[in-house]
Amino acid sequence: MVLVGKTGSGKSATGNTILGEKKFTSSSSGSSVTSSCSQKYAHRFGCKIVIVDTPGIFDTKQSNNKIQQEIFKCVGITAPGPHAFILVLSLTRYTEEEKRTVEHFVKYFGDKIYGYFIVLFTRKDDLDDEGKSLSDHIKTVPGELQLFLKKCGGRVIAFNNKLKGEEQDAQVSALLSMISENIKHNKGDCYTNEMYHEAEALIQKREKEIIQKAKIEREKEQQDIEKRLDKEYKSKLVEKTDKFNETQTQLEEIIRAIHAQEKSENVMDTKMKGSEKQVQSTQSMGMKRDELKQKLDGLLKNKMNLEKKQEEDRREMERKAQEKFKIQQRNARNVVREEVEQEKGFFSRAWSHLKSYFS
Protein backbone atom coordinates (compact mmCIF):
# COMPACT_ATOMS: atom_id res chain seq x y z
CA MET A 1 0.00 0.00 0.00
CA VAL A 2 1.10 3.57 -0.72
CA LEU A 3 0.80 6.26 1.95
CA VAL A 4 0.02 9.70 0.51
CA GLY A 5 -0.35 13.01 2.32
CA LYS A 6 1.27 16.24 3.43
CA THR A 7 4.11 16.63 5.89
CA GLY A 8 2.88 16.33 9.47
CA SER A 9 -0.28 14.40 8.61
CA GLY A 10 1.03 11.30 10.36
CA LYS A 11 1.96 9.11 7.37
CA SER A 12 5.07 7.62 8.96
CA ALA A 13 3.37 7.03 12.31
CA THR A 14 0.47 5.40 10.48
CA GLY A 15 2.90 3.18 8.59
CA ASN A 16 4.43 2.08 11.90
CA THR A 17 0.99 1.34 13.31
CA ILE A 18 0.11 -0.83 10.31
CA LEU A 19 3.43 -2.69 10.47
CA GLY A 20 3.17 -3.15 14.23
CA GLU A 21 6.66 -1.80 14.90
CA LYS A 22 8.64 1.39 14.42
CA LYS A 23 10.22 1.13 10.99
CA PHE A 24 9.56 4.64 9.65
CA THR A 25 10.97 7.72 11.38
CA SER A 26 8.05 9.88 12.48
CA SER A 27 7.80 13.29 14.12
CA SER A 28 4.99 15.29 15.65
CA SER A 29 6.51 18.51 14.33
CA GLY A 30 5.66 20.05 10.99
CA SER A 31 9.12 19.38 9.58
CA SER A 32 9.39 16.76 6.86
CA VAL A 33 10.78 13.45 8.08
CA THR A 34 10.17 11.57 4.84
CA SER A 35 12.06 13.38 2.08
CA SER A 36 12.12 10.45 -0.33
CA CYS A 37 9.98 7.40 -1.08
CA SER A 38 10.88 4.56 1.25
CA GLN A 39 9.53 1.05 1.68
CA LYS A 40 9.20 -1.12 4.76
CA TYR A 41 7.45 -4.42 5.30
CA ALA A 42 6.33 -6.81 8.00
CA HIS A 43 4.48 -10.12 8.28
CA ARG A 44 1.22 -9.65 10.18
CA PHE A 45 -2.19 -11.30 10.21
CA GLY A 46 -0.91 -14.11 8.00
CA CYS A 47 0.31 -11.93 5.15
CA LYS A 48 3.24 -9.81 4.06
CA ILE A 49 2.44 -6.09 4.27
CA VAL A 50 4.57 -3.76 2.15
CA ILE A 51 4.19 -0.02 2.73
CA VAL A 52 5.63 2.80 0.65
CA ASP A 53 5.82 6.09 2.53
CA THR A 54 5.86 9.03 0.10
CA PRO A 55 7.24 12.51 0.85
CA GLY A 56 4.96 15.49 1.17
CA ILE A 57 5.09 16.35 -2.52
CA PHE A 58 4.04 19.99 -2.43
CA ASP A 59 5.45 21.06 0.91
CA THR A 60 9.07 19.91 0.71
CA LYS A 61 10.28 22.61 -1.73
CA GLN A 62 11.48 20.01 -4.22
CA SER A 63 11.91 20.67 -7.93
CA ASN A 64 9.32 19.39 -10.36
CA ASN A 65 11.83 16.88 -11.73
CA LYS A 66 12.50 15.57 -8.22
CA ILE A 67 8.77 15.26 -7.56
CA GLN A 68 8.36 13.26 -10.77
CA GLN A 69 11.27 11.01 -9.81
CA GLU A 70 9.68 10.35 -6.42
CA ILE A 71 6.39 9.35 -8.06
CA PHE A 72 8.35 7.12 -10.43
CA LYS A 73 10.08 5.55 -7.42
CA CYS A 74 6.65 4.84 -6.00
CA VAL A 75 5.81 3.04 -9.25
CA GLY A 76 9.08 1.09 -9.27
CA ILE A 77 8.75 -0.02 -5.66
CA THR A 78 5.09 -1.05 -5.91
CA ALA A 79 5.10 -2.69 -9.38
CA PRO A 80 3.17 -4.59 -10.69
CA GLY A 81 0.86 -2.29 -8.74
CA PRO A 82 -0.35 -1.46 -5.21
CA HIS A 83 -3.52 -2.82 -3.67
CA ALA A 84 -4.33 0.50 -2.02
CA PHE A 85 -3.42 4.19 -1.96
CA ILE A 86 -3.97 5.54 1.56
CA LEU A 87 -4.56 9.30 1.76
CA VAL A 88 -3.52 10.17 5.31
CA LEU A 89 -5.26 13.31 6.61
CA SER A 90 -5.32 15.18 9.86
CA LEU A 91 -8.73 15.67 11.43
CA THR A 92 -8.23 19.42 11.58
CA ARG A 93 -8.40 20.48 7.93
CA TYR A 94 -8.15 19.52 4.27
CA THR A 95 -5.36 21.74 2.95
CA GLU A 96 -4.48 23.05 -0.48
CA GLU A 97 -1.33 20.92 -0.43
CA GLU A 98 -3.39 17.78 0.11
CA LYS A 99 -5.76 18.70 -2.71
CA ARG A 100 -2.82 19.23 -5.06
CA THR A 101 -1.23 15.95 -3.94
CA VAL A 102 -4.37 14.05 -4.91
CA GLU A 103 -4.59 15.93 -8.21
CA HIS A 104 -0.95 15.10 -8.94
CA PHE A 105 -1.48 11.38 -8.37
CA VAL A 106 -4.66 11.39 -10.47
CA LYS A 107 -2.75 13.21 -13.22
CA TYR A 108 -0.11 10.49 -13.50
CA PHE A 109 -2.14 7.45 -12.46
CA GLY A 110 -5.49 8.26 -14.05
CA ASP A 111 -9.05 8.31 -12.71
CA LYS A 112 -8.85 4.56 -12.12
CA ILE A 113 -6.83 5.36 -8.99
CA TYR A 114 -10.02 6.46 -7.22
CA GLY A 115 -11.04 2.81 -7.11
CA TYR A 116 -8.03 2.09 -4.90
CA PHE A 117 -7.99 5.17 -2.65
CA ILE A 118 -8.81 4.94 1.05
CA VAL A 119 -8.95 8.03 3.26
CA LEU A 120 -7.40 7.55 6.69
CA PHE A 121 -7.83 10.22 9.34
CA THR A 122 -5.22 10.31 12.10
CA ARG A 123 -5.73 11.43 15.72
CA LYS A 124 -8.90 9.45 16.24
CA ASP A 125 -8.25 9.97 19.95
CA ASP A 126 -9.32 13.61 19.49
CA LEU A 127 -12.70 12.42 18.20
CA ASP A 128 -13.01 10.03 21.12
CA ASP A 129 -12.20 12.82 23.59
CA GLU A 130 -14.95 14.95 22.05
CA GLY A 131 -17.39 12.05 22.03
CA LYS A 132 -17.77 12.25 18.24
CA SER A 133 -17.95 9.45 15.71
CA LEU A 134 -16.12 9.38 12.38
CA SER A 135 -19.47 9.78 10.63
CA ASP A 136 -20.12 12.94 12.64
CA HIS A 137 -16.74 14.34 11.61
CA ILE A 138 -17.20 13.58 7.91
CA LYS A 139 -20.36 15.71 7.90
CA THR A 140 -18.24 18.73 8.89
CA VAL A 141 -15.41 18.38 6.34
CA PRO A 142 -15.24 20.68 3.27
CA GLY A 143 -17.36 19.83 0.26
CA GLU A 144 -14.29 19.11 -1.85
CA LEU A 145 -13.21 16.39 0.57
CA GLN A 146 -16.72 14.96 0.70
CA LEU A 147 -16.69 14.80 -3.11
CA PHE A 148 -13.33 13.03 -3.00
CA LEU A 149 -14.70 10.53 -0.47
CA LYS A 150 -17.62 9.87 -2.78
CA LYS A 151 -15.25 9.21 -5.71
CA CYS A 152 -13.38 6.79 -3.43
CA GLY A 153 -16.54 4.82 -2.76
CA GLY A 154 -16.81 6.12 0.78
CA ARG A 155 -13.82 4.13 1.97
CA VAL A 156 -12.72 5.97 5.10
CA ILE A 157 -11.25 4.97 8.44
CA ALA A 158 -9.70 6.70 11.47
CA PHE A 159 -6.56 5.70 13.40
CA ASN A 160 -5.26 6.44 16.85
CA ASN A 161 -1.53 5.89 16.39
CA LYS A 162 -0.98 5.95 20.15
CA LEU A 163 -2.76 2.64 20.67
CA LYS A 164 -0.82 -0.50 21.51
CA GLY A 165 -1.47 -4.22 21.68
CA GLU A 166 -4.91 -5.60 20.88
CA GLU A 167 -6.44 -2.15 20.36
CA GLN A 168 -3.80 -1.34 17.76
CA ASP A 169 -4.30 -4.73 16.10
CA ALA A 170 -8.05 -4.17 15.91
CA GLN A 171 -7.81 -0.92 13.91
CA VAL A 172 -5.13 -2.36 11.60
CA SER A 173 -7.27 -5.45 11.05
CA ALA A 174 -10.20 -3.19 10.15
CA LEU A 175 -8.06 -1.39 7.54
CA LEU A 176 -6.78 -4.66 6.05
CA SER A 177 -10.34 -5.98 5.87
CA MET A 178 -11.38 -2.82 4.02
CA ILE A 179 -8.51 -3.30 1.57
CA SER A 180 -9.35 -7.00 1.11
CA GLU A 181 -12.98 -6.20 0.38
CA ASN A 182 -11.93 -3.57 -2.14
CA ILE A 183 -9.56 -6.05 -3.81
CA LYS A 184 -12.53 -8.41 -4.24
CA HIS A 185 -14.56 -5.52 -5.62
CA ASN A 186 -11.73 -4.92 -8.12
CA LYS A 187 -11.86 -8.61 -9.11
CA GLY A 188 -8.65 -9.43 -7.28
CA ASP A 189 -6.57 -7.00 -9.29
CA CYS A 190 -4.05 -4.53 -7.98
CA TYR A 191 -3.99 -1.02 -9.42
CA THR A 192 -2.14 -0.87 -12.73
CA ASN A 193 -1.86 1.15 -15.93
CA GLU A 194 0.37 1.35 -19.00
CA MET A 195 3.18 2.97 -17.00
CA TYR A 196 3.06 0.14 -14.46
CA HIS A 197 3.04 -2.46 -17.24
CA GLU A 198 6.19 -0.99 -18.76
CA ALA A 199 7.82 -0.64 -15.34
CA GLU A 200 6.99 -4.26 -14.53
CA ALA A 201 8.54 -5.45 -17.82
CA LEU A 202 11.76 -3.55 -17.01
CA ILE A 203 11.77 -4.90 -13.46
CA GLN A 204 11.31 -8.49 -14.62
CA LYS A 205 14.23 -8.04 -17.00
CA ARG A 206 16.37 -6.75 -14.13
CA GLU A 207 15.22 -9.68 -11.96
CA LYS A 208 16.42 -12.11 -14.63
CA GLU A 209 19.81 -10.38 -14.62
CA ILE A 210 20.03 -10.73 -10.85
CA ILE A 211 19.01 -14.40 -10.98
CA GLN A 212 21.45 -15.12 -13.81
CA LYS A 213 24.25 -13.59 -11.74
CA ALA A 214 23.15 -15.75 -8.81
CA LYS A 215 23.26 -18.85 -11.06
CA ILE A 216 26.84 -18.08 -12.06
CA GLU A 217 27.73 -17.61 -8.39
CA ARG A 218 25.99 -20.93 -7.61
CA GLU A 219 28.03 -22.75 -10.26
CA LYS A 220 31.26 -21.22 -8.95
CA GLU A 221 30.27 -22.18 -5.42
CA GLN A 222 29.74 -25.77 -6.60
CA GLN A 223 33.28 -25.79 -7.96
CA ASP A 224 34.54 -24.36 -4.67
CA ILE A 225 32.70 -27.12 -2.78
CA GLU A 226 34.49 -29.79 -4.81
CA LYS A 227 37.83 -28.08 -4.22
CA ARG A 228 37.23 -27.82 -0.45
CA LEU A 229 36.16 -31.47 -0.23
CA ASP A 230 39.09 -32.56 -2.36
CA LYS A 231 41.51 -30.65 -0.14
CA GLU A 232 40.01 -32.02 3.07
CA TYR A 233 39.38 -35.65 2.10
CA LYS A 234 41.51 -36.68 -0.88
CA SER A 235 44.79 -37.27 0.98
CA LYS A 236 42.96 -39.05 3.83
CA LEU A 237 41.11 -41.33 1.40
CA VAL A 238 44.30 -42.06 -0.55
CA GLU A 239 46.10 -42.97 2.69
CA LYS A 240 43.29 -45.28 3.85
CA THR A 241 42.99 -46.85 0.40
CA ASP A 242 46.74 -47.53 0.30
CA LYS A 243 46.63 -49.13 3.76
CA PHE A 244 43.62 -51.20 2.74
CA ASN A 245 45.32 -52.39 -0.47
CA GLU A 246 48.56 -53.15 1.38
CA THR A 247 46.73 -55.21 4.01
CA GLN A 248 44.70 -56.98 1.34
CA THR A 249 47.92 -57.92 -0.48
CA GLN A 250 49.37 -59.30 2.77
CA LEU A 251 46.21 -61.29 3.39
CA GLU A 252 46.28 -62.75 -0.11
CA GLU A 253 49.92 -63.78 0.38
CA ILE A 254 49.10 -65.49 3.69
CA ILE A 255 46.14 -67.30 2.14
CA ARG A 256 48.33 -68.53 -0.74
CA ALA A 257 50.96 -69.70 1.74
CA ILE A 258 48.34 -71.57 3.77
CA HIS A 259 46.98 -73.21 0.63
CA ALA A 260 50.51 -74.23 -0.37
CA GLN A 261 51.13 -75.68 3.11
CA GLU A 262 47.86 -77.60 3.03
CA LYS A 263 48.68 -78.94 -0.45
CA SER A 264 52.09 -80.06 0.75
CA GLU A 265 50.55 -81.85 3.70
CA ASN A 266 47.99 -83.58 1.49
CA VAL A 267 50.65 -85.33 -0.61
CA MET A 268 52.21 -86.80 2.52
CA ASP A 269 51.19 -90.19 3.78
CA THR A 270 47.87 -89.63 5.50
CA LYS A 271 49.00 -92.02 8.23
CA MET A 272 52.00 -89.87 9.01
CA LYS A 273 51.57 -86.88 11.20
CA GLY A 274 53.25 -83.62 10.23
CA SER A 275 56.16 -82.48 12.31
CA GLU A 276 55.44 -80.26 15.27
CA LYS A 277 57.21 -77.43 13.44
CA GLN A 278 54.86 -77.75 10.45
CA VAL A 279 51.80 -77.72 12.72
CA GLN A 280 53.02 -74.60 14.52
CA SER A 281 53.73 -72.90 11.18
CA THR A 282 50.22 -73.64 9.91
CA GLN A 283 48.66 -72.39 13.15
CA SER A 284 50.79 -69.23 13.07
CA MET A 285 49.78 -68.47 9.49
CA GLY A 286 46.13 -69.08 10.39
CA MET A 287 46.33 -66.62 13.26
CA LYS A 288 48.06 -64.08 11.00
CA ARG A 289 45.34 -64.56 8.41
CA ASP A 290 42.62 -63.93 11.00
CA GLU A 291 44.42 -60.81 12.26
CA LEU A 292 44.75 -59.45 8.73
CA LYS A 293 41.07 -60.16 8.02
CA GLN A 294 40.10 -58.27 11.15
CA LYS A 295 42.43 -55.41 10.26
CA LEU A 296 41.08 -55.36 6.70
CA ASP A 297 37.51 -55.18 7.97
CA GLY A 298 38.46 -52.25 10.21
CA LEU A 299 40.24 -50.42 7.40
CA LEU A 300 37.29 -50.96 5.07
CA LYS A 301 34.89 -49.67 7.71
CA ASN A 302 37.06 -46.57 8.32
CA LYS A 303 37.34 -45.92 4.59
CA MET A 304 33.56 -46.26 4.12
CA ASN A 305 32.91 -43.97 7.10
CA LEU A 306 35.24 -41.34 5.64
CA GLU A 307 33.53 -41.61 2.24
CA LYS A 308 30.17 -41.34 3.98
CA LYS A 309 31.33 -38.25 5.89
CA GLN A 310 32.59 -36.72 2.64
CA GLU A 311 29.23 -37.33 0.98
CA GLU A 312 27.34 -35.92 3.98
CA ASP A 313 29.51 -32.79 3.91
CA ARG A 314 28.95 -32.48 0.16
CA ARG A 315 25.18 -32.75 0.54
CA GLU A 316 25.13 -30.23 3.39
CA MET A 317 27.30 -27.74 1.49
CA GLU A 318 25.17 -28.16 -1.63
CA ARG A 319 21.98 -27.80 0.43
CA LYS A 320 23.21 -24.51 1.90
CA ALA A 321 24.37 -23.27 -1.50
CA GLN A 322 21.04 -24.20 -3.08
CA GLU A 323 19.09 -22.57 -0.25
CA LYS A 324 21.18 -19.42 -0.69
CA PHE A 325 20.38 -19.45 -4.41
CA LYS A 326 16.65 -19.89 -3.72
CA ILE A 327 16.74 -16.94 -1.30
CA GLN A 328 18.48 -14.85 -3.96
CA GLN A 329 15.75 -15.84 -6.42
CA ARG A 330 13.00 -14.91 -3.97
CA ASN A 331 14.72 -11.65 -3.03
CA ALA A 332 15.38 -10.52 -6.60
CA ARG A 333 12.31 -8.26 -6.52
CA ASN A 334 13.40 -6.75 -3.20
CA VAL A 335 16.85 -6.03 -4.64
CA VAL A 336 15.24 -4.16 -7.55
CA ARG A 337 13.00 -2.23 -5.16
CA GLU A 338 16.00 -1.23 -3.07
CA GLU A 339 17.84 -0.05 -6.18
CA VAL A 340 14.84 2.12 -7.07
CA GLU A 341 14.46 3.40 -3.51
CA GLN A 342 18.16 4.23 -3.19
CA GLU A 343 18.42 5.56 -6.77
CA LYS A 344 21.15 3.08 -7.63
CA GLY A 345 21.82 0.66 -10.48
CA PHE A 346 18.49 -0.11 -12.14
CA PHE A 347 16.98 3.26 -11.16
CA SER A 348 18.73 5.35 -13.85
CA ARG A 349 17.95 2.88 -16.63
CA ALA A 350 14.27 2.61 -15.67
CA TRP A 351 13.87 6.38 -15.18
CA SER A 352 15.25 7.07 -18.66
CA HIS A 353 12.65 4.69 -20.11
CA LEU A 354 9.65 5.93 -18.13
CA LYS A 355 10.21 9.66 -17.61
CA SER A 356 8.24 10.40 -20.80
CA TYR A 357 5.10 9.53 -18.82
CA PHE A 358 5.81 12.54 -16.60
CA SER A 359 6.44 15.12 -19.32
Over which residues does each language-model region extend?
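Glycine-rich, N-terminal phosphate-binding loop of Rossmann-like dinucleotide-binding domains
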Residues: 89-90
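C-terminal non-catalytic interaction/localization modules
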Residues: 1-51, 58-66, 77, 96-116, ...
